[in-house]
Amino acid sequence: MTINDPIADMLTRVRNANMVRHDKLELPASNIKKEIAEILKSEGFIKNVEYVEDDKQGVIRLFLKYGQNNERVITGLKRISKPGLRVYAKANEVPKVLNGLGIALVSTSEGVVTDKEARKRNIGGEILGYIW
């Protein structure tokens, strides 16, 4: 089965695993998914990320993070730019998510970065999604 929107598939898998409080999840690997996974780790939304090479495209293994009383660290994920309706923002129009409590994933000419990093580097791009 082919996946038309692999980023939406990744966000949906994370959302579903988070809702049922799974410790880890696996998804097919790609370069953009690896960049998104590294951002999730650096921003503290997940514990760890592993890359497993196989004879096909490889697998990304994400280890989800929960609070002391098993509360979710990721409370929401939303895909913004979709294959049928792309959403772009200039450097001065990159949105803040919940007044800075969440992050926006921005695909730029320098790779996938957070909204804070895009504003700091003064670059715009495609708004992939929001995570809070």
From Swiss-Prot:
Origin organism is Staphylococcus saprophyticus subsp. saprophyticus (strain ATCC 15305 / DSM 20229 / NCIMB 8711 / NCTC 7292 / S-41)
Q: Which HAMAP family match?
A: Ribosomal_uS8_B
Family annotation (NCBIfam families): PRK00136.1
Q: Which domain of life is it from?
A: Bacteria
Which residues span the membrane?
none
Q: Which UniProt keywords apply?
A: Ribonucleoprotein, Ribosomal protein, RNA-binding, rRNA-binding
Q: What is a single molecular function from GO for this protein? A: structural constituent of ribosome
What is the protein name given in its UniProt record?
A: Small ribosomal subunit protein uS8
Functional summary from the UniProt entry: One of the primary rRNA binding proteins, it binds directly to 16S rRNA central domain where it helps coordinate assembly of the platform of the 30S subunit.
Q: Which Pfam families match?
A: Ribosomal_S8 (PF00410)
Per the record, the similarity remark reads:
Belongs to the universal ribosomal protein uS8 family.
Q: Name one GO biological process term.
A: translation
* InterPro entries assigned to the protein according to its UniProt record, in alphabetical order: Ribosomal_uS8, Ribosomal_uS8_CS, Ribosomal_uS8_sf
Membrane among keywords: no
